[in-house]
Amino acid sequence: MQKRGDGIMVGTKRVILLAGHNFISPGCNTNIDGKLITEFDLTTHLVAEIFKRERLIGIDLIIKARNDFGNLVNEVNSLNGDILISCHFNAYDRKAQGTEVLYAHTSSKGRKLASVAQDILTKHLGLPDRGIKPTKPEDRGGSILNKTKPVAILIEPFFLDNIKNKDYLEKSIEKVSNAIIEILEYVDKNEL
């Protein structure tokens, strides 16, 4: 088997799994049993769990989390990925529910991957389907989706601010983890 210029075997897809937010800007949150749980806490936990479990031959999985406001677009582009999955959780009014996936408005491959990811996430979570959402660079999540080289999606599996029970949260994270593994299996076996 031949290697690409970046040392990865030809035919292998490099997938970047990005934990959304950082220590400075931790994203949305919920309070469970007096403990504040942030979006960044959960996204870093989620990508680490997936990295431990993922063993697909055709996938070179890179996990990324940030601790500052450096230029994320340049950082992602320097990783020479084929696919970017940016992991987030939603928030609104502590009542909203559902799953949605964002993609760059000009990317037909991003739209296809978003549609596949949305179907898989809603199947695993059983939450209302809020659909896939095209984004422009100035929109929420738009910069990472529109200015990076890989085919990119941003997943919002559920509304974190609507979760009040630790057991439900743990089960939901497990379901999201299983869904992302299924998305990676799709990426491994299919072209976009």
Q: What are these regions, as identified by a protein language model?
A:
Residues 37-45, 70, 107-112, 167-175:
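Soluble non-cytosolic domains of exported or imported proteins
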Residues 2-73:
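Active-site histidine-acidic residue metal-binding/catalytic motifs
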Residues 9, 73, 83, 105-159:
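Catalytic cores of processing enzymes, dominated by hydrolases/peptidases
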Residues 13-16, 27, 35, 84-93, ...:
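Active-site-adjacent mobile loop/cap segments within catalytic or ligand-binding domains
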